[in-house]
Amino acid sequence: MLYFILMTPKPCHAYYYGGLPVKGTRRKGRLRVEEDTVAFEAPEWKGGERIHLQIPFSKMEKIFLSRDNYYGTDTVLFNLTFHDQAEQSFTLRFAPIALIPRRRMALQKAWFDYLAQAISSLGSASPLSTK
């Protein structure tokens, strides 16, 4: 069981931008922390499959930020690299969202700090990359 001094971030809406072998990109879903896992869910959508993902902290390798310009807005994307039961590596690309920019920045900072701390507490070689 992992114990963190950091406060667990609030569940929030997040956009999925790809990285998994499922159809459909840029879909709105729900991101939350459950005990020692990060959960992401997105419903079925216009030809896209339902996403129900539970990523244990022990399977996470690194998290880094990237920027993209989707639909004319500068978007900060989280890139969470993890491996599944078959030891295949995936990079989940998502962005926590809030309507008010100041709150969105605070929300993104809280989630990034929490995930970086969770990964680094497991003793990974390079838990945080600021590519």
Enumerate the language-model features and the residues they cover.
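Anionic N-terminal interaction surfaces
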Residues: 1-36, 103-104, 110-113, 128-131
